[in-house]
Curated annotation (Swiss-Prot):
Protein name: SCO2-like protein RF_0960
Entry's family note: Belongs to the SCO1/2 family.
GO molecular function: metal ion binding
Keywords carried by this UniProt record: Copper, Metal-binding
Xref: PANTHER family: ELECTRON TRANSPORT PROTIN SCO1/SENC FAMILY MEMBER (PTHR12151), LINALOOL DEHYDRATASE_ISOMERASE DOMAIN-CONTAINING PROTEIN (PTHR12151:SF25)
InterPro entries: SCO1/SenC, Thioredoxin-like_sf
Organism: Rickettsia felis (strain ATCC VR-1525 / URRWXCal2) (Rickettsia azadi)
C-alpha cells in the first residue's frame, strides 16, 4: 500500500514537471508583440513597393516622380467620387502636413486617382481645393494608372454599374504611403492610423 502511495506521488510530481515545462515552452514560443497599429515593415513579404512614375498633374502638366525628391511625401490612391474613405484620408493627410510644418518638417501630400476616366486634371484641381493647398493631384490614362498602382501594390476594382453607367463606384485599398526624400518607400499607414503614429515613426528615423 505504501509503495502504491509513493508511485502515485511520483506520477503527480512528474505530471507537474511536464505541465510546467509545457507552459514554459508555450510562453517562449508565443507570438511577439505587434508593432503600432498601421505600421508595416519596409518590405512586407520581400515585395518591393513603389518606384518611378510619370503622370499628369491637376494643372495638366507632365509630372515625374523625381519632382518629389528632396522632400518627404505622402501618397494616397483614391478617386474624387469616393463618398467617405478618400475625403477622410485626405483630411487626415492635411492634418499631418500641418503638424509636420509646425515642427519645420516639409512634406508633400499627393493624391493619385484610380479613376482616370472621370478624374481629369480639371476635376482633380476643383476637388483638391477642399484640402491642403500643397496637394498634388495626379491622373493619366488607364495604362499609366495601372502601372503606378501595380508598383505600389494598390488594389482597386469596379463594384457596380454597367459600362455606360456614369455613377459607378470603385472598391480599393486605403493606405497612405510615406516616401523618403530619395523617392524610396518607407512605410504605409492604414486609415485608422493617427498623425501621432507617423510623427513617432519620423522621430525614430
Amino acid at each position: 500500500m505504501k509503495m502504491q502511495s509513493n508511485v502515485i506521488k511520483i506520477i503527480i510530481v512528474i505530471s507537474l514537471l511536464i505541465g510546467v515545462g509545457a507552459l514554459y515552452l508555450l510562453l517562449s514560443l508565443r507570438t511577439p508583440e505587434k508593432p503600432l497599429a498601421g505600421q508595416v515593415n519596409i518590405y512586407e513579404d520581400n515585395v518591393k513597393i513603389g518606384g518611378d512614375f510619370e503622370l499628369i498633374d491637376q494643372n495638366g502638366e507632365i509630372f515625374n516622380s523625381d519632382e518629389l525628391k528632396g522632400n518627404l511625401s505622402l501618397i494616397y490612391f483614391g478617386f474624387t467620387s469616393c463618398p467617405d474613405i478618400c475625403p477622410t484620408s485626405l483630411n487626415k493627410m492635411t492634418e499631418i502636413v500641418e503638424i509636420l510644418n509646425k515642427h519645420k518638417i516639409d512634406i508633400l501630400p499627393v493624391f493619385i486617382t484610380i479613376d482616370p476616366k472621370r478624374d481629369t486634371p480639371i476635376v482633380l484641381k476643383e476637388y483638391l481645393k477642399h484640402f491642403h493647398p500643397k496637394f498634388i493631384g495626379l491622373t493619366g490614362n488607364e495604362q499609366q494608372i495601372k502601372g503606378v498602382t501595380d508598383k505600389f501594390k494598390v488594389f482597386y476594382a469596379r463594384v457596380n454599374g454597367d459600362d455606360d453607367d456614369p455613377n459607378y463606384m470603385l472598391d480599393h485599398s486605403s493606405f497612405t504611403y510615406l516616401i523618403d526624400a530619395n523617392g524610396k518607400y518607407l512605410k504605409h499607414f492604414y486609415l485608422d492610423s493617427s498623425p501621432k503614429e507617423i510623427m513617432e515613426f519620423l522621430k525614430g528615423n
